């Protein structure tokens, strides 16, 4: 009887210990939650950005609640974030800037003039050397976009209109990578 009681007590203790779940994608561990300001965001999904069959970065989308509709994510004025970890030495600052510029062109249908100043600020965040293992957190909170590199905030600017174009790079009709889009939407 003592063994049964002790077993039940230990079992109850083991299951009451909090666990910090994580998700691994392409060798990169993404936490299942992320704190942005006062908000706790949950990992919606993640995937790998590929180009010419090479893995470039692992990306994860964090939202206040899970969502699979890409248009709702783009239009939403709620806190959200994209986490990226560079997994290839092929990504340089110049290549990242080119990809971002191309992404904004596609996301806005070529009409970048209303947000051009914010695009330039965003691009400036990628001017420093980029190397394998670098992390970027692009978050939207309290009406502004914030960019952090390796855990250090670089800049904060923009508004909802800019955020919509920015998230359109990953979730628009012509995303940077369709498989990454589906992964971050939780479909893969």
Task: Outline where the language-model segments fall.
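Positively charged n-region of N-terminal signal peptides that target proteins for export
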Residues: 1-4
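Bacterial N-terminal signal peptides
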Residues: 7-16
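Terminal leader/tail segments of proteins
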Residues: 20-188
């Amino acid at each position: 009887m003592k063994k049964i009681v002790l077993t039940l007590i230990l079992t109850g203790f083991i299951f009451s210990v909090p666990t910090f779940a994580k998700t691994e994608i392409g060798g990169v561990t993404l936490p299942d939650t992320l704190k942005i300001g006062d908000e706790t965001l949950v990992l919606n999904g993640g995937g790998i950005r590929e180009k010419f069959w090479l893995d470039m970065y692992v990306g994860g989308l964090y939202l206040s609640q899970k969502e699979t509709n890409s248009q709702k994510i783009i239009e939403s004025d709620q806190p959200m974030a994209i986490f990226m970890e560079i997994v290839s030495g092929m990504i340089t600052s110049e290549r990242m800037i080119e990809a971002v510029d191309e992404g904004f062109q596609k996301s806005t249908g070529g009409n970048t003039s209303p947000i051009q100043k914010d695009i330039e600020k965003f691009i400036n965040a990628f001017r420093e050397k980029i190397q394998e293992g670098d992390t970027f957190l692009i978050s939207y909170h309290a009406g502004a976009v914030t960019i952090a590199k390796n855990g250090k905030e670089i800049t904060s600017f923009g508004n909802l209109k800019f955020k919509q174009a920015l998230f359109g790079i990953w979730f628009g009709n012509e995303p940077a990578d369709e498989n990454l889009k589906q992964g971050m939407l939780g479909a893969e």
